[in-house]
Structure formats: structure tokens, C-alpha cells
């Protein structure tokens, strides 16, 4: 009996020592892990804090590199492996391009994690022809809305009311436009999308498999062309003017000149600090619902994470930690966009109004062919709403559709 006890204690001692060695090795391995994250200035501080919390728990090191948002996508394809990131902040419409080029890795979050997100946010980060795979974890959602200065105009129930009140305020304030919506010489298909969808336009159709079909281009759809005369009317009366850029639109609204401004939640703080009485709503239907584009932003794990030996750690950070309600609440507070995680929804009343304005919205296409659309669609609006000498809308949109089709091939 005594010998048995001795053997048992000896065995327990060996097991304890072995466990201690494994723990020490694990800790050393975690401490050796350095994860590089590329993000933009809006999120850098919050990403550093949130990722730092994960790193402290896991004995890892986080290095955050700040870049202009669009440069994250563009630089990922040219950076040397040694300088490449393991994790990036990304827009969902980058998914097709990055996945097709093998620059990001598919993610496989648990069913419990997936349940915390609206289906469209996960679909937005999914890509594939035969089988779709998830390439990003959603972190924030955004869409534009119609901001109404309620001291200058009533919230319109119809597009005709919007048009009438906008033109009345245009005349009163001696403006060259009725609705403060940004375009500028470069065009802005994103901010013009509610008008585009309301007239019956669409970007790509959907095939029998449920995938976007880049051969079905709706930039000059029959419904849009049938209603193109409305664009000519808006141009003639000055409801919309493509010479208006972002700064002009914002200043006109904040100075109490324009009664209507089309913008997104990134300007929520600006609105709250303006002292104006305002309401955010969806643009009223024209001939069809004037729905906005839906944008989803999140995090992706790059192909370089495996090269750097941190694939497992980077995946855990993104699929489990960045997906959590606590992490997304912190990120939302920093970048002024509602969190994608439904249990982390912001209680901010202005963000809630922008969320309500997203009803029926269309996720921006995430296939590579979308890169061929932005410029020409934006220019169709620029040319047809530039005031004197404008191109008839039907001509402008047919021209854009042909140019897009030629680029896609």
C-alpha cells in the first residue's frame, strides 16, 4: 500500500512537471507571436486597444500600421512578404478581388459566432463561384440616408414632396442646387445610388445559382431608361448639380442653407455638434424604392499570416475576438459606425436612424468586376446633371453601360 502511494505521488509529480514544461513552452510560443495589423486612422486607436486586450491574454504582441483606407487593399498586392500584414481592416466589396488573387484566407467561424451577425453581412464577405467561402468577419455596417433640417422643411413622405421643398429652399437660399448630394468632377456613384435604384437601375443581375452575374449589367436597364427623363428634369430645375462636391454639400447643410443632405453615419458626430434640428430617413421612393448601397467593414486574415507562422493566432484574433460584442462596441464607438454584431448594437439615436434608412438596401457588389463600374456610372451622373450643356440622361447611361461591358469583356 505504501509503495503504491509512493508510485502514485511520483507519477503525479512527473505529470505536474510535464504540464509545467508544456505551459512554459506555450507561453514562450505566444510571446514569440507578433501579429501585424493594417488599419486606417479612424480605427487605429480602437484596433490597438482591442487587439491589445487579446494580446495581453494570449501573450502575443500586436503591431498596428496605419494607412489610408484604400491603400490597404492596393498595397496588399504589392508589398514584400516580410513587410506584409497578417490582418487587415477591409471593406466587403474588396472580397472578390482579394480572394480571387489569393491574398486573403477563408475563415470558418463557429455557428455560435455566425448567429451574432445579420446574414447579409456574412454574405457580403463571401466569395466563390461553385462554393462560396467566408473571407472576412463583419465589424461595422454603414449606409447613407437623407438628412432633413426640420427647421427648414418637413420630412417628405414622397419624392414629389422632397423635390418641392428642396427647390423652395434652393430659391430662398439662392443656391445652385436643391439637394446637397456630393458628386464633383470625379463623380460619386455611391452617394447617387438611391436615385439610381429609385429610377429602376441596378448594377448586376443574379444568375440561377444565386451569384452576381457580371454579364447582366443594369446601368441602362429598360426601367431606368424609361424614367431617364426625370434626371433631365432634375438637372433643368437644379434639384441635383454634379458640380457639388463633398465639402460644398456639407457646408450648405451645416450653414442652414440646404434643407436636405445625403450623407452617412461617419458624419453623425458632425450632425450632433451642429446645433441643427434634424432627422435621418431613407430617400422617398421615386418609381421604385430609393434604397441605398449597404457597406460592411470588417477584418480579414491575409495569406501572409501563415507565411509568418501566425496563421492560427491571427485567425483566433479575427474570428473569435474581433467578432465579439465587447470588441465591436469599442470599435463602433471609435469609428462612428454601427457594429455588425447584433448584440453590440449602438444605442446612439442618430446611428439608429441611419440603420433604419438601410431598409431594403443593396450590399455593394463584392466581385472584381465592380471595379469597372464605379467610374463610368459616376460619370453618367456627372454628365447628365452638370447644368447647362448636360448630356441627355438616356445617352449618358447607355454610354456608361457600354463602357462597363467593354471593360468587363
Residue ranges of predicted features:
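Short helices/loops that flank or line small-molecule/ion binding pockets
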Residues: 73-84, 101, 167-168, 232-234, ...
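Conserved N-terminal structural module of periplasmic/extracytoplasmic solute-binding proteins
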Residues: 2-9, 24-96, 265, 287, ...
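Conserved C-terminal helix/tail region of periplasmic/extracytoplasmic solute-binding proteins
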Residues: 359-409
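A structural signal for short loop-to-beta-strand junctions that line the ligand-binding cleft
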Residues: 78, 84-86, 114-150, 288-291, ...
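Extracytoplasmic/periplasmic solute-binding protein
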Residues: 133-139, 144, 163-213
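Glycine-centered hinge/linker elements that transmit conformational signals in sensory
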Residues: 166, 209-243
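Extracytoplasmic/periplasmic substrate-recognition and gating elements
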Residues: 153, 272-334, 387, 391, ...
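Hinge/lid segment of periplasmic solute-binding proteins
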Residues: 92-143, 157, 161-163, 280
